[in-house]
Amino acid sequence: MGCGMSTEDKEGKARNEEIENQLKRDKMMQRNEIKMLLLGAGESGKSTILKQMKLIHEGGYSRDERESFKEIIYSNTVQSMRVILEAMESLELPLEDARNEYHVQTIFMQPAQIEGDSLPPEVGNAIGALWRDTGVQECFKRSREYQLNDSAKYYFDAIDRIAQPDYLPTDQDVLRSRVKTTGITETTFIIGDLTYRMFDVGGQRSERKKWIHCFENVTTILFLVAISEYDQLLFEDETVNRMQEALTLFDSICNSRWFVKTSIILFLNKIDRFKEKLPVSPMKNYFPDYEGGADYAAACDYILNRFVSLNQAEQKQIYTHFTCATDTTQIRFVMAAVNDIIIQENLRLCGLI
C-alpha cells in the first residue's frame, strides 16, 4: 500500500486551499471597503455631509439633478415664511407695514409642496416684501422659540435670484435644501483605493429604532451634533433641549455594546450659526455650569468636553472636528483628515497593523 495522498485527501486539500484563498480575497475586499454610519439627532447636518461627498468626490450635480432640487428649494422657502407668519400670530408680533397683509394671504394660499419649473412671481414678491418688514425680522430674531429651518435666512436673502424664471440652483442652494430623511439611505463613493458605503438614518426619534439594521461590521461612526441648537427645543418634543438630546444619544451610541471597538468621529457642526448666537443667547441660560460667557473658544471647549467625557471605554478613540457642513472648502479639508483616520482604523480592524 503506497503512502501517496488519496483522491479524497487531494480533494480535501484543494477545498481547504480554495477556502483559504477566498478568505484572503474577502479580507482584501474588506480592507478596501469602508462602512460608515452617519448618526446624530434630527437636523444635525448628516444629509448635507452626503451632498458634500457628491460635490467633492463625484464631480458635483448635473443640470438635471440641480433642476430636481428646485421644487424642494421653493417649498423650503415658502414653508419657512409660513412658519414665521404663524409664529408672529402666536407671539403677538404685528407687521410693521399693514399693506403687507396682502402678501401674508398670498403665502397662506400656497400648498405645502410647491410644484413647477419656476416660483410664481406673486410668491417671490410676497416673500421679498415680507422679509423687508421689520415685524417679520423681529420674529425671525426669536426663531429659537419655534421650529424654523436653518436655511430660511439664506433663501430669503436670495429670493430675487430664486424667483427668476431661469433659476438654476447653485451648489450652496442644494446644500442648504432640506428634506426630512426617513428610513435608511445608502450612498457609495470611491476615494483612492477605498470604497465608502455611507448610511444616513433618520435623526428624529421615531426613526431611531431602524438604526439597528446598520450596526453590523461598521468601520466607523460619523456622529453629528448641531452645536448651534444649544438654545432650541426638539421638533418632536418641545420640552426637551436639542443639545441635551444630542448628549443623551451620543452617550447611548458611544457606550453601546454594538460599538465596543468602533471608533467615533464627532462633528460639532453649524459653527457659523453657533458663533452668531453666542452673544445674543447666553449659553449659561441652558447649561448653568458653563462659565465662559460669549467667548467662542470657551464655549467650543465646554461642548467638546461635555461630549468626549461621556466615553466610558479607555480603548475607544473619539476624533473631533468643529465643522460647517455647508462650507465645501472646510469639509474637503476635514474629510481628507477623516480619510486618513479611517484607513488606519480599517487596517487595525482587519488585523493588518
Curated annotation (Swiss-Prot):
Residues annotated to bind a divalent metal cation: 47, 181
Domain G-alpha: 32-353
InterPro entries: Fungi_Gprotein_alpha, Gprotein_alpha_su, GproteinA_insert, P-loop_NTPase
Ranges annotated as spanning the membrane: none
Name of the protein: G-protein complex alpha subunit gpaA
Domain of life from the UniProt record: Eukaryota
Residue span of region G3 motif: 196-205
